[in-house]
Swiss-Prot record:
Organism classification: Eukaryota, Fungi, Dikarya, Ascomycota, Pezizomycotina
Family annotation (InterPro entries): DDX18/Has1_DEADc, DEAD/DEAH_box_helicase_dom, Helicase_ATP-bd, Helicase_C-like, P-loop_NTPase, RNA-helicase_DEAD-box_CS, RNA_helicase_DEAD_Q_motif, SPB4-like_CTE
Region (Disordered) location: 1-137, 588-622
EC number assigned by the record: 3.6.4.13
Stretches assigned to the Helicase C-terminal domain: 361-531
Subunit structure: Associates in the nucleolus with the 60S and pre-60S ribosomal subunits.
Motif (Q motif): 140-168
Entry's Gene Ontology cellular component terms: nuclear envelope; nucleolus; preribosome, large subunit precursor; small-subunit processome
Descriptive protein name: ATP-dependent RNA helicase has1
């Protein structure tokens, strides 16, 4: 039977299945977009598939019948070798329905000779059989890496030609199978640095859905995981391998179903990944060949150290290549590298020779502003830059919620992004802002790491960053890519100018910006009147005020950001209160725990104090 007929037959079988066939492992919203392309590719002969068919006929024309006779015997051997893993052996039972337990793209990719390839060997080739390109000299372009045509075509579609420094220095050794510990500033192109070798490995080993997961990428935040998933989708568009994502807040059952069908390239956040590793039956990860830990320092900062240790312990270590990327090298990162990387990893740091820790093309400044004038300055700035694309960073979820409600109420539209939102809301907001040509996003540091948001004009740090590293990651949301431009502005109170010394030590160049006093719109009286009359805004403002003080008290640089030096009357005016509201908060106790909770977005703001600590009580009326 000719190849195209077999493909059409398998697709007909797929359509008869109760649930419509195994969709490509991806997010629920991705299935609709990938499936039509797959079906068209399976039914019609594209030029790419025609070449594969000709090669197959040329190399094995006389042996095709013999290979088909062997197919069932090979499948039986596969069933025995798979041991207790039922899902892959069941899919291997009949060469005609290989795709039934896999995905549409797997069939579309193999096209005419897919059944022949499966019949030859259903076992996953060992790492000894892996032949990735060997790169000589100093490659500058992706075409010099010896990548597969499918990968090169995808990279070309993405608009990339010349590699960044981190890509030039990491991709060749990763293709050679080395473990790599990489350090590069944000916006340097790390994502493609680890995805290209991962996809090439999966392709070289001819991973099928029944083989389970071959690559796992661990990301610190859901938004960054979604972004990596988007890049992986573009990179894998011409490959047959499946890809998927598992993140907190998403439908766990749907994720488990896709994992059981087989996800070759998996992007995940640590908590949800550990959950599936421990509890999802049929999740095959015994064939794992590559583990990627992206933004390792951030993963450890937000409290996932225990989860990462368990994940590394659970995953198979034999023949596993590990790629660990971190913007900064801390003691915890070194500990994680020691338990996850094989002996003798390659350490690549592309930043240590740079004069500045931030990217070129980024104009950075600060403005000295009293606490009671901060909102007025922000309001005036946003009003004057309505045609720009701006990100404003705050220190807590409640501060973001209050300012979003206030600005939208007074007809200055903004989007908000923080850790207390439901996952669907966070995802929708993220992509809405990515696709917007102008607008303002106010957010916590949940958006500070790794997110590649196009064409951001301004980064405003309304609340101070925790340390210079956080500053660098915040401003890294602009001036991304080659020759890109961007500007950042940091608000500092007079008591906070000591932070400039820390930035200088971290090789961050900042200059003072001046904002003429006559350009500041004085809406203080209207603001206080609005907060006094609107119950919901008043309640939100009070929560924001409380959260601001708690976040300030848990600052890691308390020698600079000392809560005792704050003028609470001026701070309260910045939140729209004529006099400081009565609040009851706990300051000074369990600061490290509070800090950890703040970074995770799960902080218990406004909790009543039950232990020793510093209390701030104001006996004024609300």
């Amino acid at each position: 039977m000719s190849g195209p007929v077999d493909t059409a037959k398998s697709i007909t079988k797929k359509r008869k299945r109760k649930h419509g066939g195994g969709a490509r492992a991806a997010t629920e919203t991705d299935d609709a977009t990938t499936q039509p392309v797959v079906e068209n590719g399976a039914v019609t002969d594209s030029p790419e598939k025609g070449e594969d068919t000709k090669k197959s006929e040329k190399n094995g024309k006389d042996k095709s019948t013999k290979k088909r006779k062997v197919s069932h015997a090979s499948s039986d051997e596969e069933n025995e070798s798979e041991g207790e893993q039922g899902a892959p052996s069941q899919a291997d039972g009949d060469s005609d329905n290989n795709g039934d337990d896999g995905d549409d793209n797997s069939e579309a990719e193999n096209g005419d000779n897919g059944d022949k390839k499966d019949a030859e060997s259903t076992d996953l080739p060992s790492a000894d059989a892996l032949r990735l390109p060997t790169v000589e000299g100093e490659p500058q372009k992706f075409t010099e890496l010896g990548l597969t045509e499918k990968t090169l075509k995808a990279i070309n579609d993405m608009g990339f030609d010349t590699m960044t420094e981190i890509q030039r220095r990491t991709i060749p050794p990763l293709l050679a199978g080395r473990d790599v510990l990489g350090a590069a500033k944000t916006g340097s192109g790390k994502t493609l640095s680890f995805l290209i070798p991962a996809v090439e490995m999966l392709s070289a080993l001819r991973f099928k859905p029944r083989n389970g997961t071959g690559v796992i990428v661990v990301s610190p935040t859901r938004e960054l995981a979604l972004q990596i998933f988007g890049v992986a989708r573009e990179l894998c568009q011409y490959h047959s391998q499946t890809y998927g994502i598992v993140i907190g807040g998403a439908n766990r059952r749907a994720e488990a179903e896709k994992l059981m069908k087989g996800v070759n390239l998996l992007i995940a956040t640590p908590g949800r990944l550990l959950d599936h590793l421990q509890n999802t039956q049929g999740f095959i990860f015994k064939n794992l060949k590559t583990l990627v830990i992206d933004e390792a320092d951030r993963i450890l900062e937000v409290g996932f150290e225990d989860e990462m240790r368990q994940i590394v312990k659970i995953l198979p270590s034999e023949e596993r290549q590990t790629m660990l990327f971190s913007a900064t090298q801390t003691t915890k990162v070194e500990d994680l590298a020691r338990i996850s990387l094989r002996p003798g990893p390659l350490y690549i740091n592309v930043d240590h020779r740079k004069e500045h820790s931030t990217v070129e093309g980024l104009e950075q400044g600060y403005v000295i502003c009293e606490a009671d004038k901060r909102f007025l300055l922000l309001f005036s700035f946003l009003k004057r830059n309505l045609k720009k694309k701006i990100i404003v960073f705050f220190s807590s979820c409640n501060c973001v919620k209050y300012h979003a409600e206030l600005l939208n109420y007074i007809d200055l539209p903004v989007l908000e992004l923080h850790g207390k939102q439901k996952q669907q809301k966070r995802t929708n907001t993220f992509f809405e802002f990515c696709n917007a040509k102008q607008g303002t996003l106010i957010c916590t540091d949940v958006a500070a790491r790794g997110l590649d948001i196009p064409a951001v004009d301004w980064i405003i740090q309304f609340d101070p960053p925790d340390d210079p590293r956080d500053y660098i990651h915040r401003v890294g949301r602009t001036a991304r890519g080659a020759n890109a431009k961007g500007r950042s502005l940091m608000f500092l109170q007079p008591s906070e100018v000591g932070f400039l010394k820390h930035l200088k030590e971290a090789r961050v160049p900042v200059v003072e910006f001046e904002f003429p006093a006559n350009k500041i719109v004085n809406v203080q009286s209207q603001l206080e009147k609005l907060i006094g009359q609107n119950y919901y805004l008043n309640k939100s403002a009070k929560e924001g005020y409380r959260s601001y003080l708690q976040a300030y008290a848990s600052h890691s640089l308390r020698s600079v950001f000392d809560v005792h030096k704050l003028d609470l009357v001026k701070v309260a005016k910045g939140f729209g209160f004529s006099t400081p509201p009565r609040i009851d908060i706990q300051l000074g106790a369990s600061l490290s725990r509070d800090k950890k909770q703040q970074q995770q977005g799960r902080r218990n703001y406004g909790s009543q104090p039950h232990s020793k600590g510093l209390k701030f009580k104001r006996k004024h009326d609300d």
